[in-house]
Amino acid sequence: MELTQLINSVSSIQITGNIQRKDVADIVYDSRKVQKNSVFVAVKGFNNDGHRFLQEAIAKGAIAVVVENNEALPDDLITHSQIAKILVKDSRKALAELSKGFYKNPTSTLKLIGITGTNGKTTSAFILKNIFQSNGYKSGLIGTIANYIGTEKVDAKLTTPESNDLNKMFYEMIQAGCEFAVMEVSSHSLILNRVYGLCFKTAIFSNITSDHLDFHKSFDDYLKAKKILFDNLNNSSFAIINKDDINSEQIVKDSKAEVFTYGISDGADYKIKNIIYDLTGTDFSITYKKTDYKIHTSLIGVFNAYNAKHPHLQQLIVWGLVQKK
């Protein structure tokens, strides 16, 4: 994709310098990975600031740089280097927008399911991927333990990778023939705009407890972070929430998605009951519209039954509703 076309993807404040009619080789936020004809996005991190490495990126052949701080790169250096400087309000959002454009908006094609919550994300994501695979649907996974592009395992460095890495992996999933993608969505990634612009078909809320307050500072901030995922769903999406968690209604309060609830609580759309476990695993049933669905999992214990029920609900809900749309 030409730079002249790609810059239309980003919400810019000002563009100066030379916008070259060249194909962009890559979008990068790590100056060590800059190659000729890359676009370098200067992102402020916790320990480093990408604005410190702008000149290094230019020296390595970047044809454009994206900055939040207009003073980080003098205009005379831009003129001398014959590159473009793109000033934005939020570099992380710009990285997501550029990556989405560069990789041809891959989540508009994939059926993307996001799982968020303090507990149960990893177990639910892996079981759900296996459900899709066992039914003949090739799928990808983004998670804490590992990422998968179909059956190919890719090492995971973060629970939810940066937006550029996410869009690249989703693009690769499509190339590999994947129809579904399941991902863990951390609260950190929601605040840091790593999942900004992704098209989620379904979002699942497991629960929320007073963890990660070192990052979010308060429980209210933590709750607001989780809520971002559901606020950004459109009216053709689905939200699946744990009715047993007292914060579940707050999570979907402003969501446009169709909402389904699950849990042991009365009034849940999908009511969990009759949980029995022994050394062979756990049995329970899910009742929906007066019909009982019996479930068995090799995971042992009430807690693991709670984890297991999320993906089994997907088998009942996502399996039917996502494909219907």
Where in this protein do the model-derived segments appear?
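Short, well-ordered coil/turn elements that cap or connect secondary structure elements
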Residues: 10, 21, 60, 80-82, ...
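Short, acidic/turn-prone active-site loops that include or flank metal/cofactor-
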Residues: 71, 90-93, 207-211, 264-267
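N-terminal leader/targeting and accessory segments in enzymes
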Residues: 1-97, 246, 271-276, 300, ...
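Adenine nucleotide phosphate-binding catalytic loops in nucleotide-utilizing enzymes
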Residues: 216-223, 227, 253, 257-325
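Short, well-ordered beta-strand core segments
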Residues: 40, 65, 85, 203-204, ...
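Active-site regions of enzymes building and remodeling cell-envelope glycoconjugates
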Residues: 77-88, 154-157, 256-261
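Phosphate-binding loop of NTP-binding sites
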Residues: 93-243, 247-257, 288, 309, ...
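N-terminal-biased segments
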Residues: 1-20, 119-131, 135, 266
